[in-house]
Amino acid sequence: MITVIGGTYREIDYDDISIEIYGSGFRATKFLLENNCVVNFCTTGNIDTIKYLKENQKVYSNFTFECTEYDEVITFKYSFSLDYPSIFPHLLNIPKVDELKIESENIIAFGMLEADFMLSGNKIVYDPQTPIKPKKFSEFGKAKELVYILNKNEALSITSSEDIENIKDYFFNLEKAKAFIIKDGPFGAILYLKDKEVKIPSYITNNVNKIGSGDIFTSSFGFYWIEKGLSLEDSAINASRSTAIYCDKKVYLDTSILDSFEYKEFSTPVFSEKQIY
């Protein structure tokens, strides 16, 4: 079983003309459920949120949840699928619930706008979800094996450094991480282990639906590493492949069981050899 901690938010995409209930927490939960993983989901929400989650229990027999009462339905609005969202209420006006305390063997945790938490577990994957004063895991959690997944801005904010050697020292020696992954959008990601670095490719897709792509990378990585027992390197590569399929088709696939993979790796163009007008 995997315990997922994260938000359940409303997402409005004007380009796709859609209003959906997802958020990082529930989208991660959805990926795991679609791949037959037993999931306990810890989130916040109002009566409508609880009704929505109960409806999903009718579809997924392996799904349980714990929902802390919260009046607001936090909303992310996108003008198009590559847009940065507008968040309502404003970040400064979002009230917080009492601290959530979760103890579980296996955890995938996403930073939440409306809640802080205390975590204790064996294997934990942590995604801070914000470059604005992201929480350090050492401030609220204990794990036997910890993997951070974050982007460049989040890594800089947590470590207060742009130097990769300082960043590595911080995560390995101060945060006691087993590994960390720094995502770089279309340029893929880098998996940092104590003894090596592994470039994780991105893939060329026919469609690019960016909304939720980071959630899928984190949740699928946790699935491959925790549930399927793959190595950190194989988990990261398969997470990137699952993300590519999600961005193209909005489906949740376990790529580790596929006989073939249809997408080509993206190679960064060498702009220094091009003439710019």
Briefly describe each language-model feature range.
Residues 2-4, 9-19, 31-109, 114-123:
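Conserved N-terminal subdomain of the carbohydrate kinase-like
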Residues 6, 43-45, 128, 150, ...:
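Short beta-strand/turn micro-motifs composed of small residues
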Residues 106-170, 188:
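Conserved beta-alpha-beta core of the PfkB/ribokinase-like small-molecule kinase fold
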Residues 15-19, 159-163, 212:
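Short, solvent-exposed loop/turn segments at secondary-structure boundaries
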Residues 24-31:
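Short amphipathic alpha-helix
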Residues 1-16, 259-273:
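Positively charged, low-complexity intrinsically disordered leader regions
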Residues 32, 151, 214-215:
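Short, conserved phosphate/pyrophosphate- and ester-handling motifs at nucleotide-, phospho-/glycolipid
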Residues 134, 166-277:
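Conserved phosphate-binding/catalytic region of the ribokinase-like
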